[in-house]
């Protein structure tokens, strides 16, 4: 749709008599020609009426040795001596070197005609659009996708498309060549990376990429969605109204949610969220609606001066919890701008040039502060008055009548809203420049199109206005354009015509017109025209009948009807709308398609131009004439610096607090008072709290007064609350459970079908097709999305069709994404009653041996209760998963007296192993030429030694092989968009300023080198340069007269700091101007003259104050490290100072001589790497043996417990190898550096940051872009009969090859051929948690929790709470500054936001700030930032953590404290609640667990036991065995006892075939010990059920439950006593009867 197909070229011909020798010949082509695309060119003869044949050629450039295209056309008077042939350049005929621009020569030859134009070539021959079945997936699931391919005229492209899948790290894991409209699944790996993946598609011979995105997360679908709607688009600072946010919560099947919302407002300032604690409110959600209000007084209490908030944004954080508490959805409305004016004005699609004396059409775009279009807003232009009102898309068109005698025009437009004072209206100004006529002729053409909303089918009025020499204009007889003529009468300066808008003009086109004067002047104008975004064709999806459009039952049959263009291929998909609650960013739409197409427009302005040639250039055209009138040669497919295009796209207590605070008139003191009356989570006294106040003595006094005042009041009130769940065992009137068929099919998307509309079209040319489908069993709303494709009308995305599915009574079983084996968890089933009457319900949990629950094999767990009409009720089921894997959990429910109403749900629950997941990575360099024997490199990868593995859990090993080099991995692994934190304003003393200046310098250097500014925003570069110059100017304050530096000018000068200033300033000169070379060279002179010793070493006499800024230089071998560091600074400044510092070369030689003497004797890997870089940079080292010998694994230079130093040292080593041209050694090093995901910082990380990014940037520059690659790799895995064979060559170098195995065994890899590759072996397993293995460095840490009772006010819907107390002390000599606490919450718990806010907001603040990472699929994490941690006393924090769902047998949570300035200083401790009552009983032997019954053996409750009763019980059908046993010993384990018994006699044999072979274990709960009262060396009669047998590896164990019969069998001597004679006889008879005769039938 772009290129010449977008242009209507109208020629206004002035007829002058004359022969061809005075004729003017014109050639117009697109400014950029696309390969494999039909492009239209125009050739015209003016002043020549002689018919002729023209030959059109397209040649290669510059040699013109190859004809890429040729065509012959006839030019004659019948065609007005104007021809518009099409040309097409085959992609395979032109060079594919994407590193340089490619051009072609368009040539026209004929009698008296020879025209040539060199035109830029583009490989973008079409568009590829990718549709996925949804935008978010879970690991291991299939991604369904379709590929649509079309050219620029929206016609089908018959070209092969290459489709790649890329991980979030940018690694290509799949690459396929596919054909037209292809659809297939890609299966995500279970070990795949979480995050945003890409599908990248491109034509086989084109570098242009088209990308679709999808997210991979561990998630479960919500049951409802929440929408927030602010009362205004912005917060008007001068208003008096409060700010309201409407909350709407709807279940996905359309019904309203009943529940509660917790709302917190805040202000986002410079990216940091500042919450307003007093705004936290609890809002009832009734009938799905609620409203939250931010009062201006509440905002002012947090920010007294509201004017300081202008330019920042409000946000509202809302969490909605259902009435049953079963589900929770959190959302946020952000971007509510705080403004003085509620509007912003932009000049969009407005020409930069005007014609004096002619109308000038000005298009303005008015937005709300959030960027959305502002409709019905009056606007007015000043100076030249014109008024208008914005349309629904926010645009307004103003027509200005320009004066004749001006060359520039200052245009100011403002809003003219009646409710706003003038000073609050939005204003915007621009300057337009006069169009320059050719040779000052005064001839003008203005094309006027006044319509603003244009759609297909309209007749567009077009006016041609001409002004100039009257004699010339009178000779214009007609206007000619491509589809006909428009007559013009003599003296007529305005000619009008109508242009029919056809679908092929969507989404926009350019109308270019020109006329010629004589044989050398062209007068031209153009206008850009936007057309409403609709399909070129037709596609509608709907229900086939009225019945089909109604609400459906789950699994019901229905019909949908498709209507569209005959022959169209229609791709369908149905998506659960819950998916869009989580992510709706990547859904395909018609607007996104047109946006993509419009971005390929080679035009650069909204129309017009600086002069006649500028009109063509700005419209994306190239022109040449026979009189050498030529547009400029275009050298870029993109426009120069284009402007952003915006598409339309408690009362008494409160009274007491308030009255006390009101006693303070000063606002600051009032805040001190108010903060003191907030609850302190740690329980600190008022006096201790006051120690944390930094605002002065007056604030402390006010704080203490109010704190003591409120203390007595706070002690008076206590609240308690409880919960009672009734239970009813009545079973009458319910249908049989076996008659309830459970719902089991709950896909997130389905209906992935492609159909063709083959029916005969109706009178409107529309074909239809009716499809019968069976709905899936989810209670939700399905959104059916249809995308059609036709060869002539391209792609069309229909409006989604919604299908609602629900029942009057149903179960919503809320199952988490995964649970941990042995970890007790609560599963909730929510029962909904949408019937018009109350119902009595029975609900039951079905038994599954994979879980321990209240349901057993003998008896299911049931509850019965009443659910009121139009309400719901949650039923909790507590389970303990016992087996890893996917297991069914099923709940069924029926309604008493209503046989047709029931429901059942069966879902899969994923049970994962306990422990913590660990990864072990091994990297092997495959280089058969260097490492092979006889051309083959063989590697044996040994099995992992995993002593800490959780028993009976799987080990997964993933082998990834990728060809080197890995430059593309750098650019993706080190994401430029994550470097924003480095662009900061320098400040502080001479040392601190350099720390902060380093950040923007290295960020700019890296982003410049890797060309990644686009990821951060190109405007950020100007900001970074500004910060660099700010740092430079501030550092001049600390420059001494001798050009040396210190933290303060009154301190002694530092060798290291001066060298560092030289290094950073020298680096900055590559990016910014204005840094004095004399400043740099002055520092160099000082270093040489004052700090270099005779032996060449540099000496440090005045160490810096901030030792951490020096990185790894401190420590052993410091003289060598200081010398090497200083030498590096001298070398990096050499190009600047070589001419002005005479002694520079000799100084460098002395330093290198010194280092060479020390190099081979160095002990520290860090020192070795730094010295190697210094020597290599000076061209004094080319042998890497010493350097590589100091490495660990040949990919890193490590020292114990010093991660940031290791990053720094490894970066030095990489630089050294690059200087030595040892490129083959660099791949694994680069991979290790990028795998660290280290994005740097300032304090404590300065040197690691600067060296990492300097090294990676240098790698990008120096690494050869390609090398010969032809590798054969064979992997022999233990479980595979046939080896895996991979071939790596230049065609597939970027594709990562992967293999997986679950066997932890040795395997072999062999490689042969040319080139290198990197093999990464990643082993993932679950390791046992071992707190004692945690090493604490520089911190002492204690963590504890205790149960607390919640009053009603604090409950917030929680089921319980713990108080988490964290105490820490820094073990250094001074306080630790800027410390971070990373807390992993217990499963089911969330932090109390009020407690955390109080800790961070008051004047006695204990924490600087906090963040909560609440990923529903994982445990919640809390990050707390502390300004300091004392080294002399314990610092304690305490806050509540609230239990939102029941969890037992939980794994410990963790607390990690570490220094922001030095990540190696850290300590981790674990915590967990007391395992008390309320937990289900389980018994584990080794790693195998069984559910234990809730009651003990009930034998003691039998009133009378005799022989017949024993025979009856022992012969019950479910009794498996009867034994006489002897108790050998009792072993106590965690929570249970093991009774080890010998089976003396098998009275009734059972499943255990040989129980007398070895002693058998009988296992019982600890609480049954007293009831059982079993004694060692006593004999027992015992029998039990088959379900109580527990098969182990080579024997059976037996569970003692309430169904186990145990009686003491007296010894032989006791049987002589009268007391035991009858009992002994009964036992003997029982044994004889069952042994000889067996059980009676």
UniProtKB/Swiss-Prot annotation:
Residues covered by region (C3a-like domain): 649-727
Annotated spans, Factor H binding site: 1186-1249
Record organism: Ophiophagus hannah (King cobra)
Name of the featured protein: Ophiophagus venom factor
Entry-linked Pfam families: A2M (PF00207), A2M_BRD (PF07703), A2M_recep (PF07677), ANATO (PF01821), C3_CUB1 (PF21406), C3_CUB2 (PF21308), MG1 (PF17790), MG2 (PF01835)
GO terms for biological process, alphabetical: complement activation; inflammatory response
Domain Anaphylatoxin-like: from-to ranges: 672-707
Listed CDD domains: ANATO, complement_C3_C4_C5, NTR_complement_C3
Propeptide: 645-728, 981-1259
Gene Ontology molecular functions: endopeptidase inhibitor activity; metal ion binding; toxin activity
Record keywords, A-Z: Cleavage on pair of basic residues, Complement system impairing toxin, Disulfide bond, Glycoprotein, Magnesium, Metal-binding, Secreted, Signal, Thioester bond, Toxin
Claim: Aminoacyl-tRNA synthetase is one of the keywords in the record: no
